[in-house]
Amino acid sequence: MHTSTSFGHQMETFGNHLTSMTAAPRGGDLCLMDVNGTVRFLTAEAGFGIPSGQVQTEKGIAVRQPCVHWDGKRALFSMVIGGPAKRYDVSYQNNRWQIYEITNLDEVVNQGKVANIVKLPGQPSYNNVSPIYGSDDKVIFTSDAPPFGLAHTYPCLDEYESTPINTGIFKLDPANGTVTHLSHSPSGDFDLFLATDGRILSTRWEHLKRDQQADETRFGSNDYEIKTFESELASAKPIVAPQTKDGKPFADSRGVPYEVFPEALSAEDPTRDPNEPLHDFNEFLIWEVSEEGEGHQTMNHAGRHEFGGLYLAASKKNDPNLSENFSTITKNKYHGTVSSDAGIFQLKEDPRPGQQGKFYGTWSREFKRFASGRIFEFTMPKGFNPQNLEIIDWTHPDIDNSSNSKGHFRNPVMLMNGTMLVSYATQSDLFSPSTTYHFQIAKMEKVSSTPSNTEHKASDRLTGAGIERTIKYWGDPAQPLEAVVKMNEVDIVEVTTRQRPAKIPVHIEDIEKQVLQEEQVDENQLRLWMKERNLSLIVVRNATERDAADLQQPFNLRVPGGVSTTPNGGKVYDISHLQIFQADLVRGYRASRPGRRVLATPLHNSTQNPSIESTNLLDPTGPQGSVKIGKDGSIAAFVPATRALTWQTVSPTKEPIVRERQWITFAPGEIRTCPACHGINGKTKAGNDIPQNKPEALRDLLRTWKSDFNDLITSVPEGDVKSEGGVTLYQNHPNPFVNSTEISYQLSKAAHVTLRIYSAQGQLVAILKDQKETAGTHKVRWNSASENSSQVGTGIYVCSLQVDGRVVSNKMLSIR
């Protein structure tokens, strides 16, 4: 329905998960339209919601983002229930968007039955939106649940406006309530879609920059009462630091340390390097990740050099080799038509046979457009080089320019019969209380004789004059607010069967696999060891090589005493270390702005990763949280899993040289290779192919791991008891066992417990517990059932107990 504001609205580009009456107006319905144009209101038929003309109180609903199952017999959607019950009531805003399922969609469609709508069990008690089915029928969604259960950091705040944001992509197994955080997004993921090749695609808000609210407080006129906490612990105190450290500016006049990554945002920042331009970043790009949380990157490794903007500032002012202009390697005409505060939304794949890898999306600006703009098409299947990307405009490219008279489009959906439907609003100006948008479903119709020969327009609306309702709800006035409005028709999906996607298998590159074999390291044991400690392994083969399209950061690079890559004459940069940063929720503001924002913090021990520093080959002579770059240019490090990370190469004098511009998340147990510095799409800047060297840094790390950290149990123990930090895991009984066994453990204090069973090869078999437990002794019986309810066979299994970052494990023997 219509609203008086667009900021934070459920149809907007970001912050669209909130539940106020302006953000999520109550009074809507989940609708079903048949081929004759007849509309049914499924939620109303099932007893949800309040009819038009009545006050939207405790039973008022808003709905969004349906997703039909592969077999067409079920459907997911998100719904928030409850509006203000009386004048001045704001308590309803504590109600959350939750995921619901229609379990009999085929009967609803074919037999006219009432939808059986049930709330999915086990989902987080936070705002859960954009639900989709996984290839294995698990449910994938975005949520504003705080990472690692850090409830005191709620709501997590974005890196731009410091407003509430979702924290990334999650996966729910409805069978047992297990929730997995697949990707941690400091500024939010939106519009999830599972492609036929198994990639979860999402629009991700890119904002890796310093805190502009902090700069406004320090150098502007608005005091946000910024504070940086000592850690993410609920008991952590705000830091009060000296203003200088080692003779350099360190903290402001209140003792709040300045941010350290990336470059300065304000010209008044005393930590600013005068040889570097100010750094700001605001763009929406498409990202991909597997259903297991691996392979997280921009879609096909396509970034701003392929998809966005008009130019990027060179990172070093005194280096004439660097340029603010894009490389001509990527000739995509899209570059000239977008700005830095925009991006791609509502991406959907063409479902027709033979069209896999073809996608349709909406290009929209950031504010006051309800994530609407122009429609375009591109083909980019998995493995496609994005330097060859071509954009096909389906609508006039001048949408959002002053000359636009074409209206605004969103939610493109290609039907199985080759018809494209969109949500269309005739309004061409920006949203305002006097210029409100009204979206209706329309068919796209090709316009003849246009320069592009691909331009389409919206034909007649499928609902005619639209769906009109009288909406009433309580606000501040003595009587309920009332308006007669046309309802927005958005989030279109076709009810049909679709190809179930292939699942992307766990992967390791051949070269790194060969190094593991040469060092006699069992890949599965290494993965299991990392999973138990919530770790991932990242590998770079040659950090002196750069992608040919990146002209903005240094590419004449040299490891002192080692490899060098210098495709151009001029300045050569020595790189000696990779400094790793983790997204810590430690920035807070005044009491009227609760929650936490992430800050890029050098890699360090934490509750979730209590021994990350000793696990790595960190160099105390380098910058904090850094590992040495090998003479061959290689890098290897264990890093926190399920937490956003970024990094930079630095010189022997600790000068940042090449910075990562995005936050990346890795899955527990993932072994991830980046062949060069930021990856290579085609050729390197030196004209070389992707590096094929065996990374010596990986070899060094594996040798240390084997001698110091490989504490996996190698035999079935007799009556073994493992204890660590107030956590005791007793040997299962009986052991060996037939059919079932009892597992006991003791906690010295209340804590969140995750009890997992792994195979001897490191594959997850079952999750027996994933919840908060009281202090004392607890017992769990395992009936030999795996995650898919099948019975396990004879063999050795590992029982792993994780409690607040500490992990203890025992082996068990099953006899069938």
Place the predicted regions along the sequence by residue.
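Short, conserved, GDST-rich strand-edge loop motifs in beta-rich repeat architectures
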Residues: 1-25, 78-96, 141-163, 205-287, ...
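Structural signature of eukaryotic scaffold interfaces centered on beta-propeller domains
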Residues: 62-71, 130-134, 193-194, 327, ...
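Short loop/turn segments immediately following beta-strands, especially the blade-tip
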Residues: 103-110, 290-297, 303-306, 377-390, ...
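Conserved blade-ending motifs and adjacent loop-strand segments that build the rim/top face
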Residues: 182-189, 305-309, 340-345, 388-416, ...
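Loop/turn-rich, solvent-exposed surfaces of beta-rich toroidal or solenoidal domains
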Residues: 337-453
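Sequence context surrounding c-type heme c attachment/ligation sites in exported
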Residues: 485-486, 626-713
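Glycine-centered coil/turn sites that cap beta-strands in beta-rich domains
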Residues: 714-733, 737-758, 767, 779-785
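C-terminal tail/sorting-segment detector
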Residues: 767, 771-775, 779-781, 790-816
